[in-house]
A protein has these predicted regions:
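Extended beta-strand/beta-hairpin segments
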Residues: 1-55, 62-146
Length: 146
């Protein structure tokens, strides 16, 4: 597979506490507001680096886990991945400490719940975003089959 790259840009105006910005995907796929006070408080429709990391991790992992299902000749009617990124406020600043992946398989065929749990946890080790984050924070996976 050829090498590829993706980019995003943030336009920021003002100070850290009073300013705002807009994060934009290089592809034009999204343009979202960002603000430091809302990052650490009530978000009120404004995103944060942590939420964007959660979105990237959930998306990448969903692709990896559904690929693993296909290779195992299994499938779902729907696979939902929710990623929750946790950060602590410290004297040194904000530290991202955990990325938790909840994966729910609805209408699973071709394997039982125990096999899905094992496969889902093994798939995490193959997720490029997990691999980029690993070592900097804890990553865990929880599964549910409906």
């Amino acid at each position: 597979m050829p090498t590829f790259s993706r980019s995003a840009t943030v336009d920021w105006t003002g100070t850290i506490m009073e300013g705002t910005g807009t994060a934009k995907a290089g592809t034009g796929a999204f343009s979202v507001p960002v603000s430091f006070p809302k990052r650490i408080g009530d978000a009120q429709g404004v995103t944060s680096p942590e939420e964007l990391i959660a979105a990237a991790h959930a998306t990448c992992y969903a692709m990896v886990v559904t690929g693993a299902l296909g290779r195992a000749n299994a499938s779902t009617k729907q696979t939902v991945v929710t990623c929750t990124v946790t950060a602590d406020k410290t004297d040194a600043g904000i530290k991202i400490t955990n990325s938790h992946l909840d994966v729910t398989a609805t209408g699973l065929t071709g394997m039982d719940a125990a096999a899905f749990d094992k496969m889902a946890k093994e798939a995490e080790a193959k997720c490029p975003v997990s691999n980029a984050l690993r070592g900097s924070l804890a990553i865990d996976v929880a599964t549910k089959v409906n």
